[in-house]
Amino acid sequence: LPGRSQFGAGSTSTGVRETNIVCPGPSAMSKAEEAKKLAGRAAVENHVRNNQVLGIGSGSTIVHAVQRIAERVEQENLKLVCIPTSFQARQLILQYGLTLSDLDRHPEIDLAIDGADEVDADLNLIKGGGGCLTQEKIVAGNASRFIVIADFRKDSKNLGDQWHKGIPIEVIPMAYVPVSRTVTQKFGGVIELRMAVNKAGPVVTDNGNFILDWKFDRVHKWSEVNIAIKMIPGVVDTGLFINMAERVYFGMQDGSVNMREKPF
């Protein structure tokens, strides 16, 4: 990036530390897809170590991380155990021949890696575009370290700047109407029940629940909103991940990876 050392570190006004890592030039992939790959591989190189229990996130970006994990397992004979956050993540783990486990057998996770729909300047996240937000939050919350990988389109100053599909809220099916009314009455905006694409009716999560997408109309104090929504009867969890991410790796359009971290 202009004005920044190739491997230099700087800080933003919010105290988030940034590092820029230059990677090989783009392939024939789209820039966004190549950026996902670069971010995923950078996170795996920097954080995955032998004898770890890993939390494996969901979505399109995590595929590249799992591919690199599998390569390193074969090349370095790493002993790793993987905990999935969704049916998709479970299938990825099996597809690449990694060791599958669960929180019953491995309740303490060394490292969780996952994507995000949007990341703000304080490393707060919107997640759940793929409908796996509750499992993702459980795994991230039980990990010693939570690392996020994303492409350049997910980087925002404020939540909602780039992501316009709203904050997902997982709800018990019988409660979706009263939850929708309560959220909009308290916080404004519009709520939609997420509908399925290849089946009639709503999306049903791996937990058998519905997803509401809350399209908020202003910036809120997200830590307070997150708690308030979770207290509404019938809400399972929200797609707001507040103060959970330790580092975020953004794959950039120019083939570099921008790493941001919060001081702890």
From Swiss-Prot:
* Residues passing through the membrane, by range: none
Q: Biased-composition ranges for Polar residues? A: 8-17
Q: Can you state which reaction this protein catalyses?
A: aldehydo-D-ribose 5-phosphate = D-ribulose 5-phosphate
What domain of life is recorded for the organism? Eukaryota
Instruction: Please list the GO biological process terms of this entry.
Output: D-ribose metabolic process; pentose-phosphate shunt, non-oxidative branch
As for family, the record states: Belongs to the ribose 5-phosphate isomerase family.
Per the record, GO CC terms? cytoplasm
PANTHER family in the record: RIBOSE-5-PHOSPHATE ISOMERASE
Pathway it works in:
Carbohydrate degradation; pentose phosphate pathway; D-ribose 5-phosphate from D-ribulose 5-phosphate (non-oxidative stage): step 1/1
Q: What is this protein called?
A: Ribose-5-phosphate isomerase
Q: Which GO terms describe its molecular function?
A: ribose-5-phosphate isomerase activity
List UniProt keywords, sorted A-Z.
Isomerase, Phosphoprotein
Into which EC class is this enzyme placed? isomerase
Where are the Phosphoserine modifications?
Answer: S60
